[in-house]
Amino acid sequence: NLSLAWSNFVNNADWQHGDVWLKLLQTIVMAFAGTVLASLLAFPLAFVAARNIMPNRLLNQVLKRFFDFLRSVDMLIWALFFTRAFGPGPLAGISAIFFTDTGTFGKLYSEALENIDDKQREGVRSVGASPSSVQRYGVVPQVLPVFLSQSLYFWESNTRSATIIGAVGAGGIGLKLWEAMRTNQDWENVAYMVMLILLVVFVFDNISNVLRQRLIGKQS
């Protein structure tokens, strides 16, 4: 009956609940850490890359081409590279997400900065504010909601990506899922892990949507 089936599912060691949930947590941490670190690095670099913030064309172009390079290399390729460099594990996954998202965030952030309303910045400058204060009070309030919204979207997206790159050795539940599929035997465990991944992505997608709607609402 149903109670016996549930008891077998919970108590049967073949399901490997502890290891599966640990690997799932690794995947979540990989996505979160890679996204946060990338956004923290891209934030100051975007100010240097934006033409209206840093009037140095050479520096602007160098940084923009750097962003293009980072994001043009697929995350899976970065994962393979860092798996060879650091060995299999979450560090390779975090590094792959970090490199890819630094390029993506750098491009998105710098474009957002280049499209700000200069009137607000000029208003702060007109009262004699220092250059750093002009950016702090005239620019950051305009772009911060956009930056946070974009970061939240990629955090949710990277939760899925972390599963995929895990299959090439970057750790997390993706690697465990791939190992279970290769044996061509434990299809119950495969279905179990797939359901958990879908559940986590669904939850994170809804959290991300709610937070982004609130940020957009505050901005408007």
Task: Walk through the language-model features, giving the residues of each.
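Membrane-cytosol interface at the C-terminal ends of specific transmembrane alpha-helices
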Residues: 88-139, 145-154, 209
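Transmembrane alpha-helices and adjacent helix-loop boundaries
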Residues: 52-56, 72-78, 159
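Transmembrane-helix boundary motif in ABC transporter permease subunits
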Residues: 33-67
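Membrane-spanning helices that line or support transport/gating and their immediate boundary helices
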Residues: 43-48, 108-115, 158, 206-214
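Glycine-rich helix-loop "coupling/hinge" segments at transmembrane-helix boundaries
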Residues: 84, 159-192, 196-197, 216-220
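Generic hydrophobic transmembrane alpha-helix motif, especially the helices
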Residues: 64-98
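Transmembrane alpha-helices
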Residues: 131-165, 188-196, 200, 204, ...
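Periplasmic/extracellular loop-to-transmembrane helix junction in inner-membrane transport proteins
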Residues: 1-34
